[in-house]
């Protein structure tokens, strides 16, 4: 055997064959582009451990991690959208519904559950953005009203996680009507003195932001969430002015008083649990008391003699 054959033995040759990696094992952060192990990302509630970027979260997963384990009961799960107007744009509406149901695994863009949060009774709902952009149609409106009615019957708080592009254009006037319908339902909740906490996630736009999403007794934003009515480019073309950078992000809205607070997703359970306990006068051993902000003491006024 020659010296070359000794070097090129099978044990010394590295295979150039590509190793196949199962799909869904790794995920790239959409902000810092760091490659992340998907199982670790799920345990971290879809928050990047490198840059703290809050990625979009599936509605069902959000509710399952928000409510206490073994307390979750889904409501109005049988409701499905119908193409009552026989609407067609580049594609039939009924075909869009079928495609959205297949890709998202949900019947429509809102999921409603009742359960407990830190042993406190609560009704929670979440928008599924992957279902036609989380758009609000007649079924979404009906499910939200069902959530309000359940909160009224159970005498408990209501929490909604919004992630929507707005009203569903394929349902025309019927989708616009849901803005008034959901707002009227929340008025009944308010009249009974029950709290509604609205959590605005990325993105919350259009008819949803113009109705139920901004009607919370407390409006909470996730970090860097896009929140507004129309997009920045549309507004700039209308007013013919350059708008401030990030003017539709939750940090800008908090600074200008449009929302009440920004809460990290990993702290959401404890923070909302504390707020609900405070607003409903409910005591639970699992709730960490909310500390009152300390007021800055003003300097004593100087007398003419001291000056």
UniProtKB/Swiss-Prot annotation:
This is Acetyl-coenzyme A carboxylase carboxyl transferase subunit beta. Belongs to the AccD/PCCB family. Its cofactor is Zn(2+). It is an enzyme of class 2 (transferase). The gene is accD. Keywords: ATP-binding, Cytoplasm, Fatty acid biosynthesis, Fatty acid metabolism, Lipid biosynthesis, Lipid metabolism, Metal-binding, Nucleotide-binding, Transferase, Zinc, Zinc-finger. Pathway: Lipid metabolism; malonyl-CoA biosynthesis; malonyl-CoA from acetyl-CoA: step 1/1. It catalyses: N(6)-carboxybiotinyl-L-lysyl-[protein] + acetyl-CoA = N(6)-biotinyl-L-lysyl-[protein] + malonyl-CoA. Binds 1 zinc ion per subunit. It comes from the Bacteria. Its EC number is 2.1.3.15. It holds the Pfam family Zn_ribbon_ACC. A zinc finger (C4-type) spans 29-51. The lineage of its organism: Bacteria, Pseudomonadati, Pseudomonadota, Gammaproteobacteria, Vibrionales. GO terms for molecular function: acetyl-CoA carboxylase activity; ATP binding; carboxyl- or carbamoyltransferase activity; zinc ion binding. It is found in: Cytoplasm.
């Amino acid at each position: 055997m020659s010296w070359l054959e000794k070097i090129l033995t099978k044990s010394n040759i590295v295979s150039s064959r590509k190793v196949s990696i199962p799909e869904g094992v790794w995920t790239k952060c959409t902000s810092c582009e760091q490659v992340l192990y998907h199982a670790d990302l799920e345990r971290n509630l879809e928050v990047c451990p490198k840059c703290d970027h809050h990625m979009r979260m599936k509605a069902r997963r959000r509710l399952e991690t928000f409510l206490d384990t073994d307390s979750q009961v889904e409501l109005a799960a049988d409701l499905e959208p119908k193409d009552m107007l026989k609407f067609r744009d580049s594609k039939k509406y009924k075909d869009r519904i079928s495609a959205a149901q297949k890709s998202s695994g949900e019947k429509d863009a809102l999921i409603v559950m009742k359960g407990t949060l830190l042993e406190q009774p609560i009704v929670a709902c979440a928008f599924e953005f992957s279902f036609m952009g989380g758009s609000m149609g007649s079924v979404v409106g009906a499910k939200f009203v069902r959530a309000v009615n359940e909160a009224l019957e159970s005498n408990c708080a209501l929490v909604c996680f919004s992630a929507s592009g707005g009203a569903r254009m394929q349902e025309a006037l019927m989708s616009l009507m849901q803005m008034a319908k959901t707002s009227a339902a929340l008025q009944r909740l308010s009249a009974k003195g029950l709290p509604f906490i609205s959590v605005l996630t990325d993105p919350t736009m259009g008819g949803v932001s113009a109705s139920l999403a901004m009607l919370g007794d407390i409006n909470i934003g996730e970090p860097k969430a896009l929140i507004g009515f129309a997009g920045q480019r549309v507004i700039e073309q209308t007013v013919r002015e350059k708008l401030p950078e990030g003017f539709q992000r939750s940090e800008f809205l908090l600074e200008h008083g449009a929302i009440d607070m920004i809460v990290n997703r990993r702290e959401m359970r404890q923070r909302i649990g504390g707020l609900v306990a405070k607003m409903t006068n409910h005591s639970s051993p699992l709730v960490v008391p909310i500390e009152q902000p300390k007021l800055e003491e003003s300097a004593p006024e100087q007398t003419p003699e001291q000056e």
